[in-house]
Amino acid sequence: LANLCYSRRVPCYMISSREENEERRETNNSRLMQWFGAHVIPCEKSQIAQTVRETMEMLSAKGYRPYYIYGNQYGTGNEGVPVQAYVDAYEEICTYEAEQRIHFEYIFFPSGTGATQSGLISGHLLRKDQRKIMGVLISSREKERAEQVIWQGIQDYFQKREIPLTPVSQEEIHLLCQYKAGGYGKYNQEIIRVIKEEFCRNGIPMDPTYTGKAFWGMKEYLREKKIADSQILFIHTGGTPLFYDCLGNEEV
């Protein structure tokens, strides 16, 4: 987002929250933010809403018309907006399947804010096809809250397009919460092992916060459920700068 704002000459402000007493350190992402000229506003996690409100008021007083990508100060209201991006991605997947004459029975990916999962499930519901959309939760959210956010995104998307949903539609939310490894940004040595293995074998960079954790979770799930001989797609959602942060970590 900061990159796009820079290219369009739109001022970018980022509210950067952290846990109490959490040490703030420089990362490749933070260095890129500096390159893009983004204004980073730190705050405690308990003060996000207040900081968003104060920042919006400050920018309005300067004559700007600020837009908060999550909606209101509490982060609600825009759940349906990013969904279209992954509805489009779902269509690309279906096109690829038709060209290659294959069908993915499972689609796995990291699930954090819920936007990716809302979009993929929406595309799946519109297509009315048969498969399981499997989000691997990488945040510290509780399962009930995480599923609520995903469902809200789906509802917003369908309501704005005046397309009916049925209660059965909610049953298409498959969220794996048992592979969080302690919560957001935390990981174990098994996750690191999987990251090393995938990079050395296939040249694919993953990170322990998002893609690496989700890929590990997917492999664990497939092993535990004894799923074999199935067509499976894993969506790499980005995060390459975090891979290089991982390389510089003395624990790796």
Question: What do the predicted segments below correspond to?
Answer:
Residues 1, 7, 113-120, 212-215, ...:
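Short glycine/serine/threonine-rich phosphate/pyrophosphate-binding segments
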Residues 1-11, 121-128, 217-226:
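Alpha-helix C-terminal capping segments
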Residues 10-54:
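A glycine-rich helix N-cap at a beta->alpha junction
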Residues 15-16, 43, 68-72, 110-111, ...:
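Short beta-strand segments
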Residues 55-88, 93:
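Phosphate/diphosphate-binding glycine-rich loops and adjacent basic-rich segments that engage nucleotide
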Residues 83-174, 236-252:
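Glycine-rich phosphate/pyrophosphate-binding loop at beta-loop-alpha junctions
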Residues 169-229:
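Active-site-adjacent helical/loop segments in soluble small-molecule enzymes
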